[in-house]
Amino acid sequence: MTKDLTRGTPWKLIVQFALPIMAGNLLQQLYNTADTIIVGNFNGQQALSAVGACASLTVLFTALAIGFSIGAGVLISQYFGASREQELRQYAATAIVLMLAMGLLMSLIGVCSARFLLARALGTPEALLPLTLLYFRIYAAGLVFQFGYNIAAALLRALGDSKATLYFLLVSSVLNVVLDLVFVAGFGMGVAGAAIATVLSQIASCVIGFAYMHRRYALLRFSLRELQMDLKTAGRILQVGAPMAIQQSIVSCGFLFLQRLVNYYGESMIASYTVASRMENILMIPIIGIQNTMATFAGQNMGAQRPDRVSKGLGQGVLVSLGMTLILCLAQIAGIPLIIRAFQLDAGAAAICRLHLFSSAVAIPIFAVYFPANGMCQGVGEGFHATFYALLALGLRVVFAYVLHKTSLFGYTAIWWSQAMSWTITLVVCYVHFFRGKWKDKSLIS
């Protein structure tokens, strides 16, 4: 069912809307983590490192799918808040066709350029390259379904339905883990089995998402004849979505630069970085949930011309985000020995991973304050500012990491401490802009 976020107590609405998103993200991270544990336990640390060596690249393609979907979702949430159904349907139909076309293009690019991206751009160690290529090419072939699922989820959230995506991800997550066990543990297919399991689970979530959307929402029910791309509408979606896709991609490109630095330190570093990154993604669950919620909350309220309610919602959203994140960070610090044992790391990788897990638990609360404001920027239509902040954080983090890793004080720990330094500066710049209040005059719909 649709949900009107323009009426009621903001923090209660934010929590109610965000919890299904958080649960869905948790499921996604759990099956990613299960994927890693299964590969590491049944195929060894080299296979684990091979999957981890292309992780930042898979995140980049996911970022493009999420970014353009958010752009379409923001526009549609503002039309929904303004009760303009005809324009809403036009934008939704065009967004579906556009995203599926982009997904096909990304699949083609990923499969054809895999060797260049992994060997040249990321500097993947020669010993890992065959396995990494195999995994990534299979993953890239399924990108069209990832793009399809993300636009279906964005359209549903724009109408205030965040629960449906939880059910889609539940099915996808369970299927992924079961297929991992069948293909990797049962059939001994190694990294290829893990990649196939991921693609099949994405196909399932995409198909279920569109079927649910068609059945439950007349606003989002289209015949094949109605699914046409209006060029003017597509241009508007790209205009709004491009800054958000660029923002998501900039963050991911930062990880590409860092991945190259990680690969420089060899297999133990790659394995430990893979594990710590999986855990870091779990810490980000409440943060991303509140960020996505703030985008929809701000979009609907700006469509209803209620900017003061957006400000109130942001303050309350930050408190919710920070409280949940601190609990998870303390739990990670307490559980470091258990995490190390679960992934079967050797002594060298375990030593590195301990430091990384602790530092990420210290740094992530900074994100809990920044990302809700980032979601608000997306929702009110300030895509340029959100992109600028991401570019600022990327530039600072890469500079800090590459400069400080050469010093005796930091060494390889600069790879993760650079994160806290760069995002602290970005947070300050973001909130200076927020308190100036110029965003209150923005609107994406006329």
Feature-to-residue mapping (PLM):
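Residue-level signal for short hydrophobic patches within transmembrane helices
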Residues: W11-L30, A34, L57-L64, A141, ...
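Small-residue-rich hydrophobic transmembrane alpha-helices
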Residues: L48-L108, Q146-T165, S272-I336, F367-Y389
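Short alpha-helical transmembrane segments in multi-pass integral membrane proteins
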Residues: M1-A18, I76-G142, G186-A242, A298-A363, ...
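Hydrophobic transmembrane alpha-helices of multi-pass small-molecule transporters
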Residues: L60, N176-L181, C206-F210, I282-I285, ...
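Short runs within selected transmembrane alpha-helices of multi-pass transporters and secretion channels
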Residues: S69, I138-R157, T165-S173, A194-V207, ...
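Helix-terminus/linker motif at the lipid-water interface of multi-pass membrane proteins
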Residues: L26, L30-L48, L118-E126, V182-M189, ...
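Small-residue hotspots at the loop-to-helix junctions and early N-terminal turns
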Residues: N43-S56, T132, F136, A195, ...
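Transmembrane helical elements of multi-pass membrane transporters/channels
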Residues: Q16-D35, I138, S172, S201-S205, ...
